[in-house]
Amino acid sequence: MSAALFSLDSPARGAPWPTEPAAFYEPGRVGKPGRGPEPGDLGEPGSTTPAMYDDESAIDFSAYIDSMAAVPTLELCHDEIFADLFNSNHKAAGAGSLELLQGGPTRPPGVGSIARGPLKREPDWGDGDAPGSLLPAQVAVCAQTVVSLAAAAQPTPPTSPEPPRGSPGPSLAPGPVREKGAGKRGPDRGSPEYRQRRERNNIAVRKSRDKAKRRNQEMQQKLVELSAENEKLHQRVEQLTRDLASLRQFFKELPSPPFLPPTGTDCR
């Protein structure tokens, strides 16, 4: 059994790893900063690691893991092995954006409000120097489409202020008011009719004022006359009161006459 195992492993002993990269790796990536070692450098010449099967090729992902840990933005390597996974989604998004740019159907108003939100930054899946990689062009087209849709979704300011939908327009209410005011409005100030009206109004105002003044003066005059008459009456009352008092005093001082019969006797 050991001899059989030794016979199986003996052709691979001392044989280095294959130096040619597999079809999954892109050529021309050697020597770029920030990249891990290329698949051709995975195996050192002269290593004694045995190969399990000669007809199968192994893929070492340690280079991708090291490169992702070294880059702070955690961007994936620009390899075709990952590009195949994302080409379908990006091609579908790019086709939709190109249809909108080439005069396709307009988006509903709800989509414009979503496009105005913060845009999520997609990772850079490819470089310009990589042949056959359309991801940078698709990302640029998508960005331009989003910007154009956001600008088109913003409402343009109206040329004139529009009235609210719940209330009637302001131009309808002042119409009857203006008509009423126009019906009540008199003649022009320069017309003779206007002057005659003004003169008649002035005369009426003057008459009313003069009448009020005359009434006031008459009332004041009557007040003065009544006050003087009242004073005279008070004086007359006082005079009569004094006369009455003097007469009473005079009659009290008079003696009773003897020739007068006593009261209660008959003189006949």
From Swiss-Prot:
Residue ranges, compositional bias (Basic and acidic residues): 177-201
Pfam families for the chain: bZIP_2 (PF07716)
Span list, region Leucine-zipper: 226-254
bZIP domain boundaries: 191-254
Region (Disordered): 1-50, 98-132, 152-223
Domain of life: Eukaryota
Gene Ontology cellular component list: nucleus; RNA polymerase II transcription regulator complex
Protein location: Nucleus
InterPro entries membership: bZIP, bZIP_sf, C/EBP, C/EBP_chordates
Pro residues compositional bias, start-end: 155-173
Modification N-acetylserine occurs at: S2
UniProt-annotated stretches for the region Basic motif: 195-222
Cross-link (Glycyl lysine isopeptide (Lys-Gly) (interchain with G-Cter in SUMO)): K120
Disulfide bonds: none
Keywords, in A-Z order: Acetylation, Activator, DNA-binding, Isopeptide bond, Nucleus, Transcription, Transcription regulation, Ubl conjugation
Tissue: Ubiquitously expressed.
Subunit structure: Binds DNA as a homodimer and as a heterodimer. Can form stable heterodimers with CEBPA, CEBPB and CEBPE. Directly interacts with SPI1/PU.1; this interaction does not affect DNA-binding properties of each partner. Interacts with PRDM16.
Job description of the protein: Transcription activator that recognizes two different DNA motifs: the CCAAT homology common to many promoters and the enhanced core homology common to many enhancers. Important transcription factor regulating the expression of genes involved in immune and inflammatory responses. Transcriptional activator that enhances IL6 transcription alone and as heterodimer with CEBPB.
Protein family per UniProt: Belongs to the bZIP family. C/EBP subfamily.
Protein name: CCAAT/enhancer-binding protein delta
Protein source organism: Rattus norvegicus (Rat)
Gene (name only): Cebpd
